[in-house]
A protein has these predicted regions:
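Family-specific signature for flavin-dependent thymidylate synthase
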Residues: 1-205
């Protein structure tokens, strides 16, 4: 994962501008970072990270590309005229189906591609996007295990370069202080681990 903007200095100086203060040339304190992330004030949108996810199931990429605020996604195409690996797999499948008389009328080669095939994607997210996506994709009750694991790995990578932002990337129940998914609650909110996570998330120390 790579930071693509001048780190937290840009964030703090944008915040200082709104208060009519002069810019500074050093990173703000950890306490400032935690407070502004919890408050979700607009300057946090200036903090952006690029990352790559490799060998991700195609249908999982579909889950991630639904998010559109504060992020951009670039997924490896499945077009056979560009992706030769996909072309080989698809043609072999069609040969087998043809032998068994299972080809569907009107279908093209691309219609036979597996959604479980591994694919690669790049993403750019600002801090607000990380927070928003985590609320949905870290949920243990409503998110598929595969998508949750993929996003957890993203947050683990983020933690290596920005541990404070990663700390504020939590599932919906931690973010809101209760589980709003009354029909699909996983029970995490009833555990001591949840209370500890909630305390950690809300801390500015």
């Amino acid at each position: 994962m790579q930071c693509v903007t001048p780190n937290w200095i840009r964030v703090v100086n944008a915040a200082r501008r709104t208060w009519g203060k002069k810019p500074i040339d050093h990173e703000p304190s950890d306490k400032f970072k935690k407070k502004i992330l919890l408050a979700e004030h607009s300057p946090i949108r200036l903090l952006e990270y690029d990352f790559t996810i490799e060998n991700l199931r195609q249908w999982v990429t579909v889950h991630l590309v639904r998010h559109h605020e504060g992020c951009e996604k670039f997924v490896h195409t499945q077009r056979q005229d560009i992706n030769s690996e996909v072309e080989v797999i698809t043609k072999r499948l069609i040969e087998v189906l043809q032998e068994e008389g299972l080809l569907r009328e009107g279908w093209k080669e691309r219609d036979y591609m597996f959604q479980g095939e591994g694919n690669d994607m790049d993403m750019t997210c600002n801090a607000q996007a990380f927070i928003n996506i985590s609320r949905k994709r870290l949920c243990m009750g409503c998110t598929s295990p595969e998508t949750r694991l993929a996003w957890k790995l993203v947050i683990d990578a983020l933690r290596e370069v920005d541990s404070i932002l990663a700390e504020k990337c939590v599932p919906e129940c931690v973010y809101r202080g209760f589980c709003p998914e009354t029909d699909r609650c996983c029970g995490y909110v009833n555990t001591e681990a949840y209370q500890e996570r909630l305390k950690e998330y809300r801390s500015i120390e």
